[in-house]
Amino acid sequence: MMADPLIPWLTEHGLVCHPHTLSGTPISLGSAFQLAGLKLAWRVEIEQRRVWIVLIQRVEQRRGLKNPFAALYMLANAARAVLGPDYYLYGNVDVLAGSSLSTQRLAHFYRRWTGAKELSTGWFSLKVSQVITLSNMKKRQNNGFA
Protein backbone atom coordinates (compact mmCIF):
# COMPACT_ATOMS: atom_id res chain seq x y z
CA MET A 1 0.00 0.00 0.00
CA MET A 2 1.36 3.41 -0.96
CA ALA A 3 2.04 6.13 1.61
CA ASP A 4 -1.13 8.02 2.49
CA PRO A 5 -1.00 11.51 0.92
CA LEU A 6 -3.26 13.03 3.63
CA ILE A 7 -1.03 12.21 6.61
CA PRO A 8 1.42 15.15 6.26
CA TRP A 9 -1.47 17.66 6.12
CA LEU A 10 -3.27 16.06 9.07
CA THR A 11 -0.02 15.97 11.08
CA GLU A 12 0.62 19.66 10.31
CA HIS A 13 -2.85 20.34 11.74
CA GLY A 14 -2.08 18.63 15.04
CA LEU A 15 -3.37 15.10 14.51
CA VAL A 16 -1.44 11.92 15.22
CA CYS A 17 -2.03 9.39 12.45
CA HIS A 18 -1.30 5.70 12.64
CA PRO A 19 -1.90 2.58 10.54
CA HIS A 20 -5.34 0.97 10.77
CA THR A 21 -5.38 -2.81 10.37
CA LEU A 22 -8.01 -5.52 10.17
CA SER A 23 -8.80 -6.54 13.76
CA GLY A 24 -5.19 -6.20 14.92
CA THR A 25 -3.78 -8.37 12.12
CA PRO A 26 -0.98 -7.13 9.84
CA ILE A 27 -3.54 -6.60 7.05
CA SER A 28 -3.57 -2.86 6.37
CA LEU A 29 -6.91 -1.16 5.77
CA GLY A 30 -5.60 2.40 5.74
CA SER A 31 -4.74 5.09 8.27
CA ALA A 32 -6.51 6.49 11.34
CA PHE A 33 -6.62 9.41 13.77
CA GLN A 34 -8.67 10.36 16.81
CA LEU A 35 -10.55 13.64 17.20
CA ALA A 36 -13.38 14.79 19.47
CA GLY A 37 -13.79 11.36 21.04
CA LEU A 38 -13.96 9.49 17.73
CA LYS A 39 -11.54 7.29 15.83
CA LEU A 40 -11.73 7.75 12.07
CA ALA A 41 -9.99 5.32 9.70
CA TRP A 42 -9.76 5.87 5.95
CA ARG A 43 -7.84 4.97 2.83
CA VAL A 44 -7.26 7.02 -0.29
CA GLU A 45 -8.15 5.41 -3.61
CA ILE A 46 -6.48 7.56 -6.25
CA GLU A 47 -7.93 5.71 -9.26
CA GLN A 48 -11.51 6.15 -7.99
CA ARG A 49 -10.84 9.72 -6.77
CA ARG A 50 -12.25 8.89 -3.36
CA VAL A 51 -11.40 8.74 0.30
CA TRP A 52 -12.99 5.58 1.62
CA ILE A 53 -14.13 5.94 5.24
CA VAL A 54 -13.28 2.54 6.69
CA LEU A 55 -14.36 3.14 10.30
CA ILE A 56 -15.84 5.73 12.61
CA GLN A 57 -15.84 4.53 16.19
CA ARG A 58 -16.49 6.22 19.51
CA VAL A 59 -13.38 5.88 21.71
CA GLU A 60 -14.56 8.07 24.60
CA GLN A 61 -17.80 8.25 26.52
CA ARG A 62 -20.19 10.92 25.27
CA ARG A 63 -19.40 14.07 27.23
CA GLY A 64 -20.78 17.47 26.51
CA LEU A 65 -21.47 19.03 23.16
CA LYS A 66 -18.60 17.78 20.99
CA ASN A 67 -19.31 17.95 17.28
CA PRO A 68 -19.75 14.35 16.07
CA PHE A 69 -18.82 15.44 12.54
CA ALA A 70 -15.52 17.15 13.46
CA ALA A 71 -13.41 14.17 12.36
CA LEU A 72 -15.24 13.91 9.01
CA TYR A 73 -14.87 17.65 8.48
CA MET A 74 -11.12 17.42 9.19
CA LEU A 75 -10.74 14.50 6.77
CA ALA A 76 -12.67 16.40 4.07
CA ASN A 77 -10.48 19.49 4.58
CA ALA A 78 -7.35 17.36 4.23
CA ALA A 79 -8.67 15.72 1.06
CA ARG A 80 -9.69 19.05 -0.47
CA ALA A 81 -6.32 20.66 0.35
CA VAL A 82 -4.13 17.76 -0.76
CA LEU A 83 -6.10 15.92 -3.45
CA GLY A 84 -8.32 18.69 -4.79
CA PRO A 85 -12.05 19.50 -4.80
CA ASP A 86 -13.06 16.69 -7.16
CA TYR A 87 -12.45 13.84 -4.71
CA TYR A 88 -15.26 12.17 -2.81
CA LEU A 89 -15.78 10.90 0.72
CA TYR A 90 -17.26 7.41 0.46
CA GLY A 91 -18.57 5.08 3.12
CA ASN A 92 -21.33 2.99 4.62
CA VAL A 93 -23.71 4.77 7.00
CA ASP A 94 -24.23 3.03 10.32
CA VAL A 95 -24.87 4.60 13.70
CA LEU A 96 -22.33 4.55 16.51
CA ALA A 97 -22.86 1.99 19.25
CA GLY A 98 -25.07 3.39 21.99
CA SER A 99 -26.48 6.15 19.80
CA SER A 100 -30.17 7.00 20.03
CA LEU A 101 -30.06 7.89 16.32
CA SER A 102 -31.37 5.28 13.87
CA THR A 103 -29.43 4.30 10.75
CA GLN A 104 -32.38 5.47 8.63
CA ARG A 105 -32.42 8.88 10.30
CA LEU A 106 -28.67 9.29 9.85
CA ALA A 107 -28.97 8.29 6.18
CA HIS A 108 -31.75 10.88 5.76
CA PHE A 109 -29.46 13.50 7.32
CA TYR A 110 -26.67 12.70 4.87
CA ARG A 111 -29.03 12.86 1.88
CA ARG A 112 -31.05 15.92 2.89
CA TRP A 113 -28.62 18.19 4.70
CA THR A 114 -25.23 17.31 3.23
CA GLY A 115 -26.31 16.51 -0.31
CA ALA A 116 -24.60 13.11 -0.24
CA LYS A 117 -25.66 10.63 -2.91
CA GLU A 118 -26.71 7.12 -1.92
CA LEU A 119 -24.95 4.98 -4.53
CA SER A 120 -26.44 1.74 -3.22
CA THR A 121 -28.33 0.92 -0.04
CA GLY A 122 -26.40 2.47 2.84
CA TRP A 123 -23.37 3.49 0.75
CA PHE A 124 -22.92 7.26 0.40
CA SER A 125 -20.64 9.52 -1.58
CA LEU A 126 -20.10 13.26 -1.06
CA LYS A 127 -17.76 15.52 -3.00
CA VAL A 128 -15.20 17.03 -0.60
CA SER A 129 -15.85 20.48 -2.06
CA GLN A 130 -19.47 20.22 -0.81
CA VAL A 131 -18.57 19.51 2.83
CA ILE A 132 -19.44 22.43 5.10
CA THR A 133 -19.21 22.99 8.84
CA LEU A 134 -22.06 21.94 11.10
CA SER A 135 -22.71 25.59 12.02
CA ASN A 136 -22.97 26.57 8.33
CA MET A 137 -25.26 23.60 7.74
CA LYS A 138 -27.54 24.81 10.56
CA LYS A 139 -27.54 28.34 9.09
CA ARG A 140 -28.60 26.96 5.71
CA GLN A 141 -31.33 24.93 7.39
CA ASN A 142 -32.61 27.92 9.36
CA ASN A 143 -32.66 30.06 6.22
CA GLY A 144 -34.50 27.45 4.18
CA PHE A 145 -31.58 26.64 1.87
CA ALA A 146 -31.16 22.97 2.81
UniProtKB/Swiss-Prot annotation:
<protein>
    <recommendedName>
        <fullName>Low calcium response locus protein R</fullName>
    </recommendedName>
</protein>
<dbReference type="InterPro" id="IPR013405">
    <property type="entry name" value="T3SS_LcrR"/>
</dbReference>
<keyword id="KW-0106">Calcium</keyword>
<dbReference type="InterPro" id="IPR022797">
    <property type="entry name" value="LcrR/CesD2"/>
</dbReference>
<keyword id="KW-0614">Plasmid</keyword>
<dbReference type="Pfam" id="PF09621">
    <property type="entry name" value="LcrR"/>
</dbReference>
<comment type="function">
    <text>Involved in the down-regulation of lcrGVH transcription in the presence or absence of calcium and is necessary for lcrG protein expression in the absence of calcium. Plays an important role in the regulation of the low-calcium response.</text>
</comment>
